[in-house]
Design a protein with these regions (language model features):
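Beta1/beta-strand and adjacent pyrophosphate-binding region of the FAD-binding site
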Residues: 1-11
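N-terminal FAD cofactor-binding segment of flavoenzymes
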Residues: 37-72
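FAD/FMN-dependent oxidoreductases across multiple families
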Residues: 229-307, 311-312, 318
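Glycine-rich FAD pyrophosphate-binding loop
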Residues: 10, 22-41
Length: 411
């Protein structure tokens, strides 16, 4: 037999899965409903992703080597002095990166289908196929015919609003709302953001997350995020970041407005039968940072590698238990990272006082090195005991001082 796999969604997750599968000689169908889609996203990727996923310099708009953390009382902390000359955070436009990764998978042999999957029929037995029903889109932009495809396995890489997840009753998760404006700045203003990104914290920009100004190709992405319970306030919070960064954004022109949900924890069920969820569909976005691009691509690759392994290179159909090994490996490798970032958000994002403490703590060189090493290389890097004791003591001191620094506001 020859294994047939459908990958629904061609962002970093779907394209990574498709590439891994097709390299192993597995018949792979890659679905994308909108080939020119520009997903709302800060667009930051860690250094390890560039090498690990063989990303060319052409898709990286900016190499950020400096960060500013800006507290509720507008105290600024500069971060980046611990970076080596060849270290940076890559800033990308999702439409550029996604297009590159999707095209690469297609050139390697994945069958790219420009269509919207609207239903998934589940098999009644373990040896029957899954049937995907989809509407094909034509090159002229018009809706084409309704079609169907039968496959042995399905990978759901179709984002936070995953239809694949709904089809297998994967369960819901809490999510945040990200709102972002792309703003083209005058040349002198854009020069300020040449290799600099900014993160703002405070109740005025988000009661439970942060706001950002990230540089892109010829503009900046200015946005904020908040949990869905505060969704009605999102435009008020966006006005908050625009006000805080007003001088630096002066003369800017809004060229695009975007909004998108961000998962806040994994779905209750990520593998059901012979269907596996990856990326945002699975809920791999980290708390505290809201980062999802690397973890989306990595989860998808690990899922696809598991399929290759247990299908003997496409010669048999893996079982549900075999697919779940991908989750065990994922949780073993990254479980601690998620726990640490969850704790960080719980401790430091709960009030303006704790946010003041967080920004102050970021001024410490040991904290900066620990944070950047963990971000750039995607590991929770343990500090030596003396450094850890020092960081703990500074954290306590910062929390105490933060209560004195926090601005008094009524909302």
């Amino acid at each position: 037999m020859s294994l047939r796999v459908a990958v629904v969604g061609s962002g970093p997750a779907g394209s990574s899965a498709a590439e891994t599968l097709v390299k192993a000689g597995i018949e792979t169908y890659l679905f994308e409903r909108k080939l020119d889609n520009a997903k709302p996203c800060g667009g930051a990727i860690p250094l390890c992703m560039v090498d690990e996923f063989d990303l060319p310099p052409s898709i990286i708009d900016r190499r950020v080597r400096k960060m500013k953390m800006i507290s509720p009382s507008n105290i600024e902390v500069n971060i980046g002095s611990t970076l080596k000359d060849d270290e940076y955070i890559g800033m990308c436009r999702r439409e550029v990166m996604d297009g590159f990764m999707r095209d690469r998978a297609a050139k390697l042999g994945a069958k790219l289908i420009n269509g919207t999957v609207y239903a998934l029929d589940l098999p009644k037995s373990s040896n029957q196929p899954y049937t995907l029903h989809y509407t094909e889109h034509r090159e002229d932009g018009l809706v084409g015919d309704n079609k169907s495809l039968q496959v042995d396995l399905v990978i759901g890489a179709d984002g936070a609003n995953s239809r694949v997840a709904k089809a297998i009753d994967a369960g819901d998760y809490n999510y945040a709302i990200a709102f972002q404006e792309r703003i083209r700045l005058p040349e002198d203003k854009m020069a300020y953001y040449e290799d600099l990104a900014e993160m703002y914290v405070g109740n005025d920009v988000s009661p439970d997350f942060y706001a950002w100004v990230f540089p892109k190709y010829d503009h900046v992405a200015v946005g904020t995020g908040t949990m869905r319970v505060n969704q009605a306030k999102i435009k008020q919070l966006q006005a908050g970041i625009r006000a805080r960064a007003a001088k630096r954004l002066e003369g800017g022109e809004i060229i695009k407005v975007e909004a998108h949900p961000i998962p806040e924890h994994p779905r209750p069920r990520r593998v059901v039968g012979r269907v596996a969820l990856v990326g945002d569909a699975a809920g791999t976005v980290t708390k505290s940072s809201g980062e999802g691009i690397y973890f989306a691509a990595k989860s998808a690759r690990m899922c696809a590698e598991t399929i290759v392994e247990f299908s003997n290179g496409g010669q048999r159909i893996p079982t549900e238990d075999e697919l779940k090994i991908y989750l065990k490996r994922w949780d073993k490798q990254y479980g601690m990272t998620y726990k640490v970032l969850d704790l960080l958000q719980t401790v430091f994002y709960r009030s303006d006082a704790t946010r003041e403490a967080f920004v102050e703590m970021c001024s410490d060189i040991d904290v900066q090195k620990l944070t950047f090493d963990s971000y750039l290389y995607k590991t929770v890097v343990p500090a030596n005991p003396l450094v850890q004791m020092k960081i703990t003591a500074k954290t306590v001191g910062s929390l105490i001082r933060g209560h004195a620094l926090a601005p008094t506001r009524s909302w």
